[in-house]
Amino acid sequence: GTPTMGGIIILISVLIPTILLCDLTNIYIIIMLITTFWMGLIGFADDYIKVFKNNKKGLAGRFKILGQTLLGIIVCVLMYNHDDIVIRENLQKNQKFENEIIYNLNDNTQYFGDSQKSLKTTIPFFKNNQLDYETLTGDGQKPLITFLLFAFIVVFIITAVSNSANLTDGIDGLATGCSAIIGATLGIFCYVSGNMVFANYLDIMFIPNLSELVVFMSSFVGACVGFLWYNSYPAQVFMGDVGSLSISLFELGINL
C-alpha cells in the first residue's frame, strides 16, 4: 500500500531551482535538462503502466532500451559538435599559443592554452589521468571512426548504467542516500574542474563553464536528502522508475 512515483517530487525539486538560478544558455545545463526530461518521461510511462494499467511488467524493455539509446546519440552529438564544449590545457613556459591565458597566484604563473575541441576523458591510472579517443584511432586521422567509437561508448554507458538506481531502490532509503553522497562528490568535481587554479593543482582537466553544474547538483543533493526523510525505513513513499531512472542519468550525465 506504499505509494510510488515519488520520483516526480525529486524531478520538480531539481528542475525549479535549475531553471530559476542557472544560466540556461550553458550547454552543460541544457544537456542535463534534456536528460532529465527524457528519462523522466520514460520512467513516468513505465510507472503509469504499472500503477494505472495494472500491468506489473510496465513499459516493454525494448522501448526503454530504444529511448536510452536515442538519448545517448543526442548527448553524443551535442558533446561532439557543440562549440562551447571545450577544454583548456595547462602549458609549459616554453609553449606559446595566440589566445593563451596567464594566471598569476602568489608569484606562481600558470599558462593555459586556447579553448580546443577534444575527446579526452579523465580516467585515473592512465598517463596524465587522461584517455584520448583520437589516439585509439590513429591520432585523429580517422574522425568518423573516432566519433563512432565515442558514440558507442556513450550509448553503452547510458544504457548499461541508467538502471543502476533500480538495483538499490528496493531497500528503504538506500537509493536516495547513496545518490545524495554521489551527487555531492560530483558537484565538488564540477567546481574543481571548472576552476583553472584547482584543476591545475589537482591535475584535473580544466573545462570552462563546467562549474555552472554545481547549482544543478546542489539542487539534486537537496532533493535526495529531502526525499530521504520520507523514504527511509519505514518508507512512506517509493520513487519508482520515474525517480530511479532519472537519478541514474543525473549522475551519469555529470560523469560524461
Language model features with spans:
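Juxtamembrane helix-capping/reentrant segments at transmembrane boundaries
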Residues: 1-2, 56-68
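Short helix/strand-bridging catalytic loops that position acidic/His residues to coordinate divalent metals
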Residues: 54-57, 205-206
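Alpha-helical transmembrane segments
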Residues: 9-41, 70-121, 126-127, 149-256
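Short clusters of hydrophobic/aromatic residues that line enzyme substrate/ligand-binding pockets
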Residues: 51, 59, 123
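Short aromatic-rich membrane-water interface segments that cap or initiate transmembrane helices
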Residues: 1-2, 128-145, 204-214
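Alpha-helical transmembrane segments within multi-pass membrane transporters and channels
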Residues: 39-50
